[in-house]
Amino acid sequence: MNSIRVAVIVALSAIVSASAPDPTLPGIGSAMQDMIVKNEIAGAVTVVVSKDKVLHLETAGFADVVAKRPMSPDTLFWIASMTKPVTGAAILMLQDEGKLTVGDPVATHLPEFAALKTPSGKAANLTIAQILTHTSGLGEASGPAAAQAKTLADLVPIWLAAPMQYEPGERWKYTQSGINAGARIVEVVSGMTFDVFVQKRIFDPLGMTSTTFYPTDAQRARLATAYAKNKETGALEAVPPRPDFGPRDRPPQGNGGLYSTAADYARFCRMLLNGGTLDGRRYLSAAAMKFLTTPQTAPGLPTGFFQADTYGNRGANYGWGITTSILRTPHDGVAAMLSPGTYGHGGAWGTQAWIDPVKGVAYVLMVQRSNFANSDASEVRRAFQEAAARALEKR
């Protein structure tokens, strides 16, 4: 009888721990529940960290509604473009080692790019900085050939066959091919495939045990189902996972191929928040960090995803670092509670990480919703960030 009572107590304790992870900040959980009630999301995992610890980790709702599988701290998410800062960090690690600089012509490391021409017929002479700040004008890889690519090397001739979109440095346009070209440069310079490089140099030492381009069967079982909101009924409907699962026969795409958990990505954010170090290990130099944390685009060049007709001229309030979006000045809206100099990146399915060096905190939001009108300005992101800011002010 006693053993049964002990087992019941242990089981109940496990349920409580899973439903209300500690520590938590007040108000964030209820803000996410409001989003669930509104059918904006099925569930969420939220994390807030300081330089030295986790301030908040909380789950809400379901990872899979039909199966009634609740969100948990180890739920896996496709983080999409939140992969990009990892690619930027990899490039800057190689710069720290003297193996390249972001000012190098891309053709120095990928000779095929030497033949690339601009729309005016001039030699393109793209730099690594341009391809990683979305100012290169490089064309996108699309169509059957791109879909059948097995490696990043397979994508190079496809990028080069696509017409350039504009003269390098002339404007800012979000471009996936440039970030993947950066990942290919990591492969050529390091002698490792991109997935192996980031695993050995970033994920393993940081303890990011659930971050991968290629989830195992056990990890797939923890994957959150993605949902789209039916525009007519308002109901959330499941959509297929991306990128497609299967054997390791697809490139480790530096633009958006990673899966991760909220806690894992928060480790990466804490490393950046600490100026490139964590737990006594240095990953990036102070000089390298400046490329991630200060705009590398011109002050007057509009960047970002906020459209003038909807949000005012907010694009001018952002600059772009090496693979990071950087808030130049706060404004009303989704970023109102962030400090100048806050940087980070979101993902196509609503995930987001912001690192606020002024307040000394980082915010990580994990959801899986495929059809936000603008995931970077979504009501869900705003609700999370506002609730977190209010809670931090009261501490």
Task: Spell out what each predicted region is.
Residues 22-77, 99, 112-116, 157, ...:
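Short, conserved catalytic-motif segment at the N-terminal edge
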Residues 342, 349-362:
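Short, surface-exposed beta-strand/loop micro-motifs that present aromatic residues
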